[in-house]
Amino acid sequence: MKETKATEKNSVPKNVTGKQNPVVQFIRENLGITVGLIVLCLILVIYDITQGRTVFLTTNNIMNVLRQVATNLIIACGMTMVIILGGIDLSVGSIVGFSGCVTAMLIAYSHWPLAAAVSAGILMGVLSGAFNGLVISKTTIPPFIVTLAMMNIARGAAYVYTGAQPIRIMSDSFNFIGSGYIANVIPVPVVYLIIIVIVSSFIMNRTRLGRHIYAVGGNPTAAKFSGIKNGRVLFFAYLFSGIMSAISGVVLASRMFSGQPTAGQGFELDAIAAVVLGGTSMLGGVGKIGGTVIGALIIGVLNNGLNLLNINSFWQYIVKGIVILIAVYADFLKKKNRKI
């Protein structure tokens, strides 16, 4: 009997009792999208080779991709929390435009100090996100309808506030936020992005709030019976999404040297695509910020690759739509196989 127990003890794999390497674990959990990103990069490298000149692998192009990815991924960090809860936020693109316009107007015409103007722009995201979270958590109105309403409200407010005209910003200190470089190499938006990704990952993986988000997204009824305040969790997620959208809006306005009421159109599509490609389930309860990072990189490299290949920009919408459909269908098949 003792010999049997000893044999069973020795037969336990080390990776069951020991802590698995987080990098290896991440790659295993996101194998499909990791391979997809690698294949996409290889295609562009092969394109460089066949053309006899380096286009994709230049430092300037890679930094440009990271700068563009930063705008989308900042939004996608908030969208990840919302989708893990089984919700959706269609207002993110409009909040991007409205926040950028408010910041631009206050700097260009009201001559507010930079910090105050940026804070006011981000405040627009706080108010918009709080509205979404409050209505969704206190009523039975679906998130799709609530955020669709906010999408129109924020976009309309941007047009009214600016008179439907771009607001030019002649401020080097403001333009540095979205167009500057650290040590003449790293784009400033990438620094903000790294901080936001770290904070978002910490919230989701190391805090009680993060555990509650997964619990409510997986089974809201069970979460409620276990003592979790579902309404507070929902409110925070939409508030956080609004703040991330506003930050992205300020960064985008800085990068474009202007606040434009049309800015951010279609950004909700890119954010949702990044989240879904990253392995987050549209049904809720499953997802990782790390997966969203890879998803956003795929979207960024895909957009950049299509531009380098001189493919009409309108095709990008078709490609991204197909990519989202495939990702959602793959998630459906994965869940179906698990049930079997």
Regions found by a protein language model. Give the residues of each.
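Helix-loop-helix "hairpin" substructures at the membrane interface of multi-pass membrane proteins
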Residues: 112-118, 127-132, 183-259
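Transmembrane alpha-helical segments in multi-pass inner-membrane proteins
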Residues: 245, 255-320
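Alpha-helical transmembrane segments within multi-pass membrane transporters and channels
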Residues: 111-151, 295
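Hydrophobic core segments of alpha-helical transmembrane domains in multi-pass membrane transport
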Residues: 33-46, 79-80, 122, 151-156, ...
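Loop-to-transmembrane alpha-helix initiation sites
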Residues: 29, 143, 185-193, 234, ...
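Single transmembrane alpha-helix segments in multi-pass membrane proteins
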Residues: 44-48, 58-110, 134-140, 279-289, ...
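Membrane-interfacial amphipathic/re-entrant helices at transmembrane-helix boundaries
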Residues: 3-74, 110-115
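Transmembrane helix-bundle core of multi-pass membrane transporters
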Residues: 25, 139, 143-206, 233-236, ...
